[in-house]
Amino acid sequence: AYSWDNRVKYIVRYMYDIDNDGFLDKNDFECLAVRVTLIEGRGEFSPEGYAKNKEIMANLWNEIAELADFNKDGEVTVDEFKQAVQKNCKGKAFANFPNAFKVFIGNQFKTIDVDGDGMVGVDEYRLDCITRSAFADVKEIDDAYDKLCTEEDKKAGGINLARYQELYAQFISNEDEKNNACYLFGPLKEVQ
């Protein structure tokens, strides 16, 4: 479940493919704008926030389509996305990622940092994990969080934005299945 191939499939399936149709398209990013707006407002919908997020997500879709929609059909398949990650991200640090990936990673952090304190603690990590997978025991999630965090992370009270960016970059750019970044999104399942 922690192979590079499965991790990239996981990103497509659980982070971008909001409408669950098996590929990425403009609709996914329109849905992401609504999701991010509601999360940022903790359930309240701000028309101004939505307008901003809709523009950000439209730009993000355009950049991702430019990087990954190789056959220009308005859809990015899992294979196209993997090729784009391989070409643009694999073996690179966050600072060297295309802007589209950087923006998405920053937005992802904001949606996980529910209390807005600039840190993702174990409680927020748990909430993030249960939005994508089913767990019979919270210990499974807590064990993944312990594997993810370094002693410095634990002393700081969690993962800050810079650390999250570094971990996300390792998640999609590093093939090492033992890398602690493999646990960024919780215990992973094999993606079909």
Swiss-Prot record:
Q: Which Pfam families match?
A: EF-hand_5 (PF13202), EF-hand_7 (PF13499)
| Domain called EF-hand: residue spans | 4-39, 56-91, 100-135, 136-171
> Which annotated residues bind Ca(2+) 1?
D17, D19, D21, D28
The Gene Ontology terms for molecular function here are: calcium ion binding
Domain of life assignment: Eukaryota
Q: Assembly state and interactors?
A: SCPs from crayfish, lobster, and shrimp are polymorphic dimers; three isotypes (alpha-alpha, alpha-beta, and beta-beta) have been identified.
| Purpose of the protein | Like parvalbumins, SCPs seem to be more abundant in fast contracting muscles, but no functional relationship can be established from this distribution.
Q: What is this protein called?
A: Sarcoplasmic calcium-binding protein, beta chain
Q: Which organism is it from?
A: Penaeus sp. (Penoeid shrimp)
- Upper taxonomic classification of the species? Eukaryota, Metazoa, Ecdysozoa, Arthropoda, Crustacea
